[in-house]
């Protein structure tokens, strides 16, 4: 009788451990290293006089000081997998009014891409995740670049 009860209990415990590991916070600092090159595009969606427009700024030439500040900021933020992350294709519908695209290169090879939205969604290498304080993250990144 005890063996019959032990097997389902072990399965439930193993499932709970897998859930904890799967949903644990992941660090944004894993997407870039000091020897990588970075490029960014910041976009803000607005409506003026009834017409929608997108204001975009490209940040192509990132200085060493800016890169160090960016790496430090990336170390402070985390993101989490969702149930849908496993099956996501990198698309997201809830963008908010601000987005930041970060492209990380090793020489000329794109190794990581991050698309953060002010709504709390972040797409990393074509997988969608949730990120707390995403809007603050975007604003701090823009402060570093300006």
Annotate the PLM regions:
Residues 4-146:
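Function-determining sites in protein domains
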């Amino acid at each position: 009788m005890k063996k019959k009860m032990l097997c389902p209990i072990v399965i439930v415990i193993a499932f709970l451990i897998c859930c904890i590991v799967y949903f644990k916070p992941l660090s944004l600092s894993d997407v870039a290293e000091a020897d990588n090159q970075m490029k960014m595009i910041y976009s803000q969606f607005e409506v003026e006089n009834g017409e929608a427009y997108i204001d975009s700024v490209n940040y192509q030439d990132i200085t060493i000081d800016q890169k160090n500040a960016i790496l430090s900021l990336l170390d402070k933020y985390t993101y989490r997998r969702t149930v849908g992350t496993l099956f996501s294709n990198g698309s997201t519908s809830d963008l908010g009014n601000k987005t930041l695209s970060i492209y990380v290169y090793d020489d000329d090879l794109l190794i990581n891409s991050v698309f953060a939205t002010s709504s709390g969604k972040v797409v990393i290498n074509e997988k969608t995740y949730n990120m707390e304080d995403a809007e603050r993250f975007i604003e701090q990144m823009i402060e570093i670049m300006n």
